[in-house]
UniProtKB/Swiss-Prot annotation:
InterPro entries for this protein: 2-oxoA_DH_lipoyl-BS, Biotin_lipoyl, GCV_H, GCV_H/Fam206, GCV_H_sub, Single_hybrid_motif
Tree of life domain: Bacteria
Coiled coil: none
Native species: Burkholderia cenocepacia (strain HI2424)
Domain Lipoyl-binding: 24-105
N6-lipoyllysine: residues carrying this PTM: K65
Entry keyword set: Lipoyl
Family note: Belongs to the GcvH family.
Protein name: Glycine cleavage system H protein
Species lineage: Bacteria, Pseudomonadati, Pseudomonadota, Betaproteobacteria, Burkholderiales
Length: 126
């Protein structure tokens, strides 16, 4: 069974989201996603400064088995990307919740209401 930390929010597309003290959202892929994909060999992340809408494909994660889009969980502006993750994408396999992919600042009027909690995500992947 996959690890699903209770302090994070999730999407149906297997991204995790952590709200930081300054209100930005840190985004990564879940343990379930990395486990399903297998050995991750490449990450393509969005550009800093890019405006995105909730549900937009903003990046790609490639493994030896498959490639999958990474989606923005909310509407906003990408304010940081984890260059270390692109340099060593295999680290996501070892620590899916420790290796973040990008950070986003919510757009005015945007919300996190569509994100699901750990219980709902656990049911989704069971």
């Amino acid at each position: 069974m996959s690890n699903v930390p209770a302090d994070l929010k999730y999407t149906d597309e297997h991204e995790w989201i952590r709200t930081e003290a300054d209100g930005t959202l840190t985004v990564g892929i879940t343990d379930h996603a990395q486990s399903t994909l297998g050995d991750i060999v490449f990450l393509e992340l969005p550009e800093v400064g890019k405006s995105v809408n909730a549900g937009d494909a903003v990046g790609v994660v490639e493994s030896v088995k498959a490639a999958s889009d990474i989606y923005s969980p909310v509407s906003g502006e990408v304010v940081a990307v984890n260059e270390a993750a692109t340099d060593a994408p295999e680290e996501v396999n070892g620590d899916a919740y420790g290796v973040w992919l990008f950070k986003i600042k919510l757009a005015a009027g945007a919300s996190t209401d569509k994100l699901i909690d750990a219980d709902a995500y656990s049911k989704l992947i069971d």
